[in-house]
Amino acid sequence: MTDLKTLREQLTEVDMKIIDLIHQRQSLSKNIGSIKRKAGKPTRDFMREKQVLELATSHAEKLNMEPDVIVDVMQLLIKDRKSTRLNSSHALI
């Protein structure tokens, strides 16, 4: 049986990977915003936001996860991009 310390260490590793992926997502979103601005397109795309949430819900359901929790997480990521965009003119997604 795995002890508590080992499980916590594994959980910490997963948490750090999640943070790394969020960082990667933010960087990609920033690059998308730059491309949109150069093309004269609006940085906010409500259709894309909806698509992101639908894809997240579908994937969560396939993994037998609670979709509401995943939607909340994705909305936080989108909200983060919105606030960053407002502060520095970057895109959402």
In which residue ranges do the predicted regions lie?
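N-terminal hydrophobic or amphipathic helices and topogenic motifs
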Residues: 2-85
